[in-house]
Curated annotation (Swiss-Prot):
Family: Belongs to the transcriptional regulatory CopG/NikR family.
Chain sites annotated for binding Ni(2+): 77, 88, 90, 96
Protein name, per record: Putative nickel-responsive regulator
GO biological process annotation, one example: response to nickel cation
Length: 142
């Protein structure tokens, strides 16, 4: 097995070590292997391939980090073909929340989410994706 080196803030490393202890992992390497597998499999859901999808991406960052807001604006324009809507709000006193509503293929949405994740100084990134053509029980009600 290869050995790799990763740079990260001390606070994050402490949280990972605590997570490993709390959940019975043998060490942080096991946590990183599982997290890496999950990340790689995240957009490999065969049920979503070749379907039109809708998605929501939420990004939270500190108000002082204007480079994040600039990057969000750049990504919004770069991916205007899939960004159906975008909302910016100030929350919690000194944080900003950017919300993107997306419509596109699995590949285009995963590319967008990947670029958001690669943005430095974000505090949290969350998203969800649903097929446009399948609303399950909701579709049957109409």
């Amino acid at each position: 097995m290869s050995v790799v080196s990763v740079s990260m803030p001390e606070e994050l490393l402490e949280r990972i070590d605590q997570f490993a202890d709390d959940h019975g992992y043998t060490g942080r390497s096991e946590v990183f292997r599982e997290a890496s597998r999950n990340l790689l499999e995240e957009f490999e859901d065969k049920r979503l391939e070749n379907r039109e999808l809708m998605g929501i991406v939420t990004v939270v960052f500190d108000y002082e980090t204007t480079n994040v807001e600039e990057k969000m604006m750049h990504l919004r324009h770069e991916h205007e073909d899939i960004v159906a809507s975008n909302f910016h709000s100030h929350v919690g006193g000194h944080h900003c929340m950017e919300l993107f509503v997306l419509e596109g293929s699995l590949e285009t949405i995963s590319t967008f989410v990947g670029k958001i994740r690669a943005t430095k100084n974000t505090l949290t990134i969350d998203y969800s994706v649903l097929p446009v053509d399948d609303f399950g029980p909701l579709a049957e009600m109409t």
